[in-house]
Amino acid sequence: MTENPLGYEKISKLLKNFAVPSIVASLIGSIYNIVDQIFIGQGVGYLGNAATNVAYPFSTICLAIALLVGIGSASHVSLCLGCKEPKAAAKAAGNGIVLMGIFGIIYLLVGETFLSLLLKAFGATTDVFPYAKQYASITLIGMPFLIVTNGMSNLIRADGKPKYSMVCMVVGAIINTILDPIFIFVCDWGIAGAAWATVIGQIFSFILAFRYLWRFQTIHFEKESFLFDIKESLKICSMGISSSSNQIAVTVIQIIQYNSLTYYGALTKYGTDIPLAACGIVMKTNAIILAIVVGISQGMQPIIGFNYGARQYHRVREAYMLAIKWNLVVSTIAFIAFQFFPQSIISLFGDGDELYFEFAVLFMRTYLFMVLVNGVQLLSSSFFTAIGKALKGALLALTRQTFFLIPLTLLLPLRFGIMGVLLAGPVADFSAFVLSIVLVGTELRKQKNATNISPQ
């Protein structure tokens, strides 16, 4: 069997080859929502923006499912390949693909059945609800395709073809971007046009990703590879739970934030709809930075997973530290943009009155103040997932959202009103950063001193 370059190639070259396409693919995923937001803001107004924000939890839940199965199966595959177990790798990939399809269909049915109830729970106001329902009812159709595409992208990267994974996402995003102005302005379909443009783009990405099923090189499928195995499926989910749980926590915090902003916003001069619209714009802007960090972590994972399985711990440490340095460069640029050019960024998403821009600028500067350290927690969680320590990875993934941000979002507004919702972000970011440094530092010291560590 040919030696895998993950075990001997220069780490900087590997991270570049794997992370850059992953970053592009991850950015493309976030662009689906960003592009819709910009065109809807220009064509419908800030109520349209608020509507897409209310519907956004559907996308984060979808991503959570894709990460659960995609990251889980890809991490399992990388470990199996590192241990030179090709049949086990094929079984992991096959069961992962089957799970993607099952979860996608279930998600569509549940979402459409309880759509109105869910939108109200997500914080839709009376004025926003009609737009949100129209948008979400259409975009849910594309969710099964999105789950399979995002999930298979992780397997394609694990197969050593990150550029193809990137192409799958880029094609869909280009189609979405072309169709958005046509459907919204030329066809005059409004917010429904943006939704259909998104779905069509997702279908094209799905077709390209699914075609790769017959092109895998390090994974050799047999019919038995796709036989549903409950034990194998649970293993996959356990290895993807850290990345997925972070997204689930993101969904929960979105719902809490939207409801808190409308409640406390009603007590201020901003009202209910302005905070809701501003929050979504800030979160989706930050999603671009997080997408880059996710791309770095996805590029880092197969490198760390393979070398941990091969017991080359010095390469594990080198890959993690290089990923942290990349993150620092990105977050520094983001900090400068968010603190010094917030109004220019917000203006991209459409016009609004003076109160709208006043609150949106305040939100961006305050909530994203600790963006410099935000990515460390995500990279650290992915680090533990890659070395097979799923429980520790899951716990670390939950720290910012569940252990810090959710309680702070509920408690701080009691003292500081709507400003408390904004302050919860930087406090949670810094707290999660400190915990991440402690846990990863301890693990790296263990690896440095160990001669025979096996995945737990």
PLM regions and their residue ranges:
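Helix-terminus/linker motif at the lipid-water interface of multi-pass membrane proteins
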Residues: 31-50, 119-126, 182-189, 251-282, ...
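Transmembrane helical elements of multi-pass membrane transporters/channels
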Residues: 17-36, 138, 149, 172, ...
